[in-house]
A protein has these predicted regions:
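Noncatalytic partner-interaction/assembly domains of nucleic-acid and motor enzyme complexes
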Residues: 1-120
Length: 127
């Protein structure tokens, strides 16, 4: 189940930085087994950026509704059709991020990012 806190979370991914958070979102988008693990422990408010929060929720919502991870094509369609209620700046950020991510799915340091993110989320969940 996706957790979403309205007021954000001081104890989020801020300390890891923007690049880490973008790579983490990219891994959730394209690495189904990793997304399975993260869906159990991730509070999307851990992301500093509203666009990354909304994109992650979009992926998880699709997985919940259809019991399958979205393909690249489905993800592009979801971005075109499911984010219209968001502010235009957030929509533009999501569209740009997804286009760049699909163009280059390689994530440097993916094992490190996966381990750090899972460890962090599990520790937060225990608090």
């Amino acid at each position: 189940m996706i957790k979403d806190t309205t007021f954000g979370n001081k104890d989020g991914f801020e300390k890891f930085g923007k690049s880490f958070q973008e790579k983490l979102c990219k891994l959730i988008m394209f690495d189904r087994p990793f997304a399975d693990q993260m869906e159990e422990v991730l509070d999307v408010s851990f992301f500093e950026n509203k666009a990354l929060q909304e994109l992650t929720k979009l992926v998880f919502r699709h997985r919940t509704e259809y019991s399958v991870h979205p393909s690249e094509e489905t993800l592009e369609t979801l971005v075109r059709t499911e984010i219209s209620e968001l502010p235009e700046s957030v929509q533009a950020t999501i569209r740009n991020f997804v286009a760049k991510a699909i163009g280059n799915q390689v994530v440097a340091d993916s094992d490190y990012i996966k381990n750090q993110a899972l460890d962090f989320c599990k520790k937060q969940k225990l608090q």
